[in-house]
Every structure is written in C-alpha cells, then in structure tokens.
C-alpha cells in the first residue's frame, strides 16, 4: 500500500536552492502519494502537526534552523507522529553528525527529538538540536545578519568573517563556566560553546567526543582561549577536523548535565544559528 507523505520545505534553505532540490523526493519516494507544502516565515508548525492524520507521514526539508524551529513550535504530543528529515540547508550539521554525509537518505527525526537539552537566554527557554554558543561564532552570526540586511542576495562567507574577527576585530573576554556545580574561570576567551552533537557552524567539529545519544544525555562545553591572535587563528582553523583539542591549554572541554556560562561583557549568542544580541550569560539543562 502506498504511503502518504506531507513534504514541508523551507524555500530559503541552502541559499534558496531548497525550492528546486526538494523535488528529488519524487524519485526517492516514488510510487507514494506526495503533497508538497512550502513553509513561509508565518507558517504555523503547531497547527499543521495537530492536523496530521494517522496514515500520514511528514518529511521536514531544510537546514538546522528549520529543525530548530520545528522542535520548539510543535506540541510535545505531536512529536511522536512519524517525521523524517531531508537535509537541504547550507550547513547541515545535524545530518553530518547522525549520518555523516549529504546524500538522498531520509533520517527518522523521531529518534532524535526526545530528551533534547534546554537553553535559557534572557529568561527565554528553548530546545536546541546542535549547540548554543557565546563568543566569536555568535559575533560572526551577528555580522552575517547585518550583511543580509544590506544585501539579501549576497552569499555569506563565514570563514572570512571569522578570520577577520580572530586577527583584528573580535574583543576577547573573561568567562566563568559552571559544570554540574563545579566552577571554572578563564581569561582571553574567544568562544564558549555547549553542544548536543559534534558539529555546528557548517562542519566545525567543536567537541569530537560528544555523543548526542549519550545514555545520560550529557552535553559538552568547549572553552577556546588564547593570548596571541595569530596562534588563535592557526588553532581555530583545526576545529573542522577536531585537531584543535590537541592544544588543551587553549581548548578546554567539560562534560555535564547543567552548564552555566557567563561573560564579563555583553556578547552575541547563537542557538542553532539564531542570534541573540547583548547577552552576558546562558544556562543549559540536559
């Protein structure tokens, strides 16, 4: 018997390439009944999932930001309905973590939506699928948002932004990190990121040993610090292979279930790529 699939796709994902690539599903799910639904900025995930029938399956198509919005807007009871994920974003870090490569494979999202960590920023609590981060990566997202406001069609070069920040523009800070009640203090901090998976930021393997399927549901927090900016840039460039952890004095990783990160001056925070400005602390409960 043919199955019924409701294909939700974000046309803005993958630098707007998703609206064409989504129709690869015609071949992947051939001989099934497919109904394509375009997700606008005003799209009501909660109402949509409330109305999904027992014989229907949902395919969520987009990037990590699409998953982030989905898990935070849908009623908990509706997250048990059959939901699959088809990666069509520009970073696709969730897919990179659970599947390892970008191909035509559907991922069963139901396996990954339970026991997600919660982050509190400025009194607002959200789930996150990949990470929450203070520091230069949040600053990069802030700069990228400003570029989009001026030139919406211009591709964003995050690597270029990060290089300029590491060498010249980003101002280091002091940080206090509390992990399951134990307090740590760090100077010359560029980054303090708490992760559910290994990857974020379009392939940065920030915490190579983090397991999103950890039976205790622990998360990891990476503190990246350094006094000499050129050395910081050289070590930071190794984050895409995970080799940055070979510099333990600059890259410190803690693991736990309750994390609090505080900076001594306001900075941008990004949660699964969504930016919040003027933040001095965030807390995570796994």
PLM features per residue range, with description:
Residues 1-61, 68, 72-77, 99, ...:
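ATP/NTP phosphate-donor binding region
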Residues 8, 37, 77-190:
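Catalytic core of DAGKc-family lipid kinases
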Residues 11, 61-63, 86-88, 196:
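Glycine-rich beta-strand-to-loop/alpha-helix junction loops that act as flexible
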Residues 69-70, 93-94, 139, 270-271:
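Phosphate- and divalent-cation-binding pockets in alpha/beta enzyme and binding domains
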Residues 125-135, 139, 186, 190-195, ...:
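Short hydrophobic-aromatic micro-motifs
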Residues 148-158, 197, 202-230:
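Gly/Ser/Thr-rich active-site loops/lids in small-molecule metabolic enzymes
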Residues 171-173, 188, 215-221, 257-259:
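A generic structural signal for short beta-strands and their flanking turns/coil linkers
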Residues 181, 213, 223-286:
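ATP/nucleoside-binding phosphotransfer catalytic cores, i.e., glycine-rich phosphate-binding loops
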């Amino acid at each position: 018997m043919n199955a019924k699939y409701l294909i939700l796709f974000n046309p803005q994902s993958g630098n707007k390439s998703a609206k064409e690539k989504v129709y690869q599903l015609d071949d992947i799910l051939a001989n099934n009944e497919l109904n394509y639904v375009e997700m606008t900025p005003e799209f009501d995930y909660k109402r949509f999932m409330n109305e999904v029938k027992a014989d229907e399956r949902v395919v969520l198509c987009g990037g990590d930001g699409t998953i982030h919005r989905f898990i935070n807007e849908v009623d908990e009871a509706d997250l048990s309905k059959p939901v699959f994920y088809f990666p069509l974003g520009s970073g696709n870090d969730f897919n990179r973590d659970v599947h390892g490569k970008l191909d035509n494979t559907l991922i069963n999202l139901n396996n990954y939506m339970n026991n997600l960590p919660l982050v509190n920023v400025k009194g607002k609590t959200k789930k996150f699928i990949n990470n929450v981060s203070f520091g230069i990566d949040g600053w990069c997202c802030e700069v990228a948002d400003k570029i989009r406001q001026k030139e919406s069609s211009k591709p964003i070069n995050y690597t270029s932004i990060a290089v300029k920040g590491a060498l010249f523009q980003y101002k280091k800070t002091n940080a206090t990190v509390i992990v399951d009640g134990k307090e740590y203090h760090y100077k010359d901090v560029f980054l303090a990121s708490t992760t559910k998976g290994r990857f974020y930021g379009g392939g940065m393997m920030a915490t190579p040993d983090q397991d999103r399927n950890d039976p205790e549901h622990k998360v990891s927090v990476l503190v990246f610090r350094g006094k000499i900016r050129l050395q910081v840039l050289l070590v930071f460039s190794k984050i895409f292979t995970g080799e940055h952890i070979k510099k333990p004095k600059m890259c410190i990783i803690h693991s736990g279930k309750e994390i609090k990160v505080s900076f001594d001056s306001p900075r941008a925070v990004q949660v699964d790529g969504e930016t919040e400005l003027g933040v001095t602390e965030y807390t995570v409960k796994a």
